Amino acid sequence: GIRPDFVDFSTKTIYELKPFNPKAMQQGWKQLYKYQSLFQQKYGGTWNIILDTY
């Protein structure tokens, strides 16, 4: 399923939160691109994606 960490519908931005390490960050971007594609198909427009690390 798809479970982005946070979605801001007012700015069309999808956020994913991942630990600061290369493997997790790579996985985060992969998820974000998938979410972006799905959101653009479902809701239209251009969606921004942001990977936040901790």
Residue ranges and their predicted role:
Residues 1-54:
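Catalytic toxin/effector domains delivered as secreted proteins or via bacterial secretion systems
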